[in-house]
Regions:
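Active-site ligand-binding patch in enzyme domains
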Residues: 2-133
Length: 133
């Protein structure tokens, strides 16, 4: 099994600051590497707080890399996976609405409520209502 961790950190070792705005630490060269890594993965895992704060789409942003995935018999983008204890995620987040790949939410909350409804509503867009507790 191969696991890749991709993180941008500041020179003093921080991932983020305390402001409500997204802290951009990556350069265009960094983003090219991010898309190369995404294209090589089966799945991308992000925490729920990343979805809430950054609203990432988690797509492979390079058309050549997307085509290479398709040529290998894969979907254009890796499966999206998140972890949430609270289920406080908007069904309108890019995680759920952007891309046709499967979306998986692992949670320990007993009632995913609107999150499950949002996922079910988007089943035709590739969103799975698979939840793990």
């Amino acid at each position: 099994m191969k696991v890749t961790v991709s993180t941008a950190v500041s020179a003093d070792g921080y991932l983020d600051d305390r402001s409500p705005d997204r802290l951009i630490l990556s350069t265009p060269e960094d983003w090219a590497e991010v898309h190369r890594l995404r294209a090589a993965c089966d799945a991308i895992l992000v925490g729920a707080e990343t979805i809430r704060r950054d609203n990432p789409s988690l797509l492979v942003g390079d058309e050549v890399l997307r085509r290479e995935r398709i040529d290998r018999g894969l979907s254009p983008d890796p499966v999206k996976v998140t972890l949430t204890a609270s289920c406080r995620l908007s069904p309108e987040a890019n995680f759920f609405t952007r891309g046709d790949q499967e979306k998986i939410v692992f949670t320990s909350c007993s009632d995913p409520g609107p999150l499950r409804q949002g996922a079910t509503r988007r089943r035709d867009h590739g969103c799975s209502d698979r939840y793990r507790t």
